[in-house]
């Protein structure tokens, strides 16, 4: 509730011309209607306002006691989180990691900005294609539960995939901050192959 809006209403000539009962009725209706437009504010409201609360809320809800933080690396946010989680497992910081990514378009500001800089495709997404002319915004969430392979095998867990290596890079100065730089992508791939001790010629897509 913004008292400034009420003060502006009080200052109008039309409001001043009303008797005290009419003024009180209008102010009461003003506050009631304004508050009706706002969702109740609880501790679950904060993840939508402060990204660093997201991981903390998950830890709180599931009573998790290890380190928790939110990684923001734009499109690579999920990979950055997975890389950090995997490193912590290998370093013995914890035995299980819950990691992943979530993206929601909470308002029109982000959409408008991407439109203004020409980052959004006017028709559709065409990854790895010469006709690519931008990206299409989407929403979604995905969570992975990670363990060291030996621990998962010992505990009889169902194993969906094994992470053999991870590579990351920044594109540096290229076409633009929103456009991929092929050299940066190559660096990431080389680091992933090296981390996994795999020769690229052995990989079949």
Feature roles, as predicted:
Residues 1-205:
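Condensing-enzyme catalytic core of the thiolase-fold
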